[in-house]
């Protein structure tokens, strides 16, 4: 009888705050971390009776990376709009001519589930190939009952096909469905009374998100949706304070939000309310870069008051067409002046908190699922130093090496 399935020796690791630890050992048993700590404190019975052992030669092991904010299920692309923007055409003019989010909605509606899988699976596999083991995927390009459910079904299937843990978020409140043009309140009522309960009844949704902004949904409408989610025992998230300060972060915190995302215009009151609610700030440097934003999220304020910060790709066709979480990590350092430990924690422990999964994943601790990445580097700073470079690595998911 073996004491463990796998024994990883002579490794460096990171703790939940992103600090690097050296001379570490990790014991894996039945898909979970049985023990971890300094190698000189490793219990003798694990040393003497391990089914398999690996000398890591001082290389870095991190938790499996977590992309906690994506919109990667969609059809088509918006490269033509990118060309127009490069020629000086405004987003408003593009939207008036039928472009913008509603163009993606139409292409996604027109696509079958099989076509959505064919187009979206490569995006998920690209994340997996960077050491990402858990991904959040939002709906929001259907904007009617049939197509929102279609997107959520595809997201579930993608996780099974790619061998990646997928958490689904219902984002019917991404924009007003075109059938309800000029009557956003009727759309919100339909969303709360029909769409969200159907997604819940089919077990397709893990959380509920709202884009609360002057160009999307009002504070009052966001609260109506949050209350509907609460009535269904679903946790909430919020696209908040991206373009202006509407108080969405404080509202979301009042409902115990897992995360508020974007946050370029967050103020101190919103940040303090997020702290009280243990709400994570999810920062999205890809959108900041692609949209040429000038207003940065208030990292110093978040740091000062103690709001946990996560980083994600925001993978989507309109404002962040990327599938590289490693690139986002480098951008977070360069654009947002986050420290190396902050960024490493942002894509592991803090990202797990943003999904409500911190009890199972996100850090190297006894009892947690053994999602790990063994990198071909010894200095943790290298994960943020390189950009657009595929660092060699091996990935373990639930105790099994998958690459």
UniProtKB/Swiss-Prot annotation:
InterPro entries with a match to the protein in the record = Amidohydro-rel, HutI, Metal-dep_hydrolase_composite, Metal_Hydrolase
Q: Which GO terms describe its cellular component?
A: cytoplasm
List keywords of the entry alphabetically. Answer: Cytoplasm, Histidine metabolism, Hydrolase, Iron, Metal-binding, Zinc
- MF annotations from Gene Ontology: imidazolonepropionase activity; iron ion binding; zinc ion binding
As its record notes, the protein acts as a catalyst of:
4-imidazolone-5-propanoate + H2O = N-formimidoyl-L-glutamate
EC?
3.5.2.7
Pathway where this protein functions: Amino-acid degradation; L-histidine degradation into L-glutamate; N-formimidoyl-L-glutamate from L-histidine: step 3/3
Its signal peptide is none
Q: Which Pfam families match?
A: Amidohydro_1
The free-text cofactor remark is: Binds 1 zinc or iron ion per subunit.
Record: residues binding Zn(2+): 69, 71, 239, 314
Q: Which domain of life is it from?
A: Bacteria
| Cofactor(s) the protein needs | Zn(2+); Fe(3+)
Where does the chain bind N-formimidoyl-L-glutamate?
141, 316, 318
**NAD keyword on record:** no
| Binding, 4-imidazolone-5-propanoate | 78, 141, 174, 242, 319
UniProt cross-references to SUPFAM superfamilies, sorted A to Z: Composite domain of metallo-dependent hydrolases (SSF51338), Metallo-dependent hydrolases (SSF51556)
Question: Which BP terms from GO are recorded?
Answer: L-histidine catabolic process to glutamate and formamide; L-histidine catabolic process to glutamate and formate
Any idea what job this protein has? Catalyzes the hydrolytic cleavage of the carbon-nitrogen bond in imidazolone-5-propanoate to yield N-formimidoyl-L-glutamate. It is the third step in the universal histidine degradation pathway.
- By what name is this protein known? Imidazolonepropionase
Gene, per the UniProt record: hutI
